[in-house]
Amino acid sequence: MGELSEYRQGCGHPEQLTFETSMEFRRINNLPPYVFSIINGLKIEARRAGADVIDLGFGNPDIPSPQIAVDKLCEAAQNPKNHRYSLSRGLPKLREAAAALYERKWGVTLDPELEITNTIGSKEGFSHLMWVLLDRGDAAIVPSPSYPIHIYGPLFAGADLRQVPMRHLADPRVQDFETDFFDSLTTAYDVGWPRPKVLIISFPHNPTGAVVDLVFMQKVVDFCRERDMIVVHDFAYADMGYDGYEPPSILQAEGAKECAVELYSMTKSFSMAGWRSAFLVGNAEVVQALVKLKSYLDYGMFQPVQIAATVTMNEAPDFPKEVCAIYKGRRDALIDGLAKIGWDIPKPKGSMFVWAPIPEPYKDMDSVEFCSHIVRECDVALSPGLGFGPGGEGFIRFALIENEQRIAQGIRNLKRGLTKLG
């Protein structure tokens, strides 16, 4: 059937195998090339050769989860009753805790029975949500650049994807991207047939770190209500706002529940990446449609994880502030350090990433070539902008997943290898 050629670990994706086969897997074979695997392969090769590669590519949180979550998980796992199948939509107390969190932080009232469902991480929730919202031949609008699953999810559902290059959104030096964003959005909706059914957004934005206010969210809601569209807001960085900025929930906008759903995850806010605890909240019809689909696909998360997540949201509500402060320190260390070696980048006000244009002396390289050069010459792994869609070409992404001392070492490595800077 095939020959196993090489093992590679994906960047933010499950472990991947490069495997040659004569069999036809249409849904898989039609996916775009996964460019992160190139950098991962070089990183693995360098580490096997003994290099100390500083990984600022994969957005995998390194901050320990709350101790209360760990303790409650261990306690709940001792009870055999918790070893059985659970509810695919999550325990009632878990959904009630999520509702309380939204009320407390954003003043949004949610019905735990109808407007909240637990998902096994936001990627699982988003991917299956696309199955609910889109059929073959439907269209979805996705800004470019975007988080890769926002691109792949509609394709898995068989939909047509309209990646809208957002030139101002992509450039961190442009602070006001709103006019360009809505002009591009309107054009994407008006051109072609069928009319798009779904808009996918995420703010604070991955990969660019761009942020928006509630006025922007209201315009998104109004845009979608006028066109009978559903807007899906991936709120992965809900608790990561810097320099006085606080990210708004799209559900704070007037009329949002008529057309909007939002994904909230404990991955970044509570540094619980491997726990896979997230929620879809908002429009009851959409939420309940996902509940029905999930009832055929899974039996929910391991119940001790649900119990631990419930207790954590209720009893450690300030933990996200501690996490945010750590990422802010790392952001400042990275950007201040880069400025000292001649690479000036504006400080993003949100997310756990820093998005940067390729420095002028290296503009002859595309983003994959530049990141490959960085791994080979600097022992630093970054993410090429092309991996986030065509609108990301010419840029690279730093993930703030090393401590400040390691970031400082990374800066020294970059100074050594990027000889054209200065």
Give the residues covered by each predicted segment.
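PLP-dependent class I/II
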Residues: L4-E24, N29-Y34, I39-I54, G59-A76, ...
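Glycine-rich loop-to-alpha-helix module at the N-terminal edge of alpha/beta enzyme cores
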Residues: L56, N79-Y85, A97-R104
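Short beta-strand to alpha-helix junction loop
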Residues: R89-G90
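Conserved AMP-binding/adenylate-forming core of the ANL superfamily
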Residues: L94-A98, G121
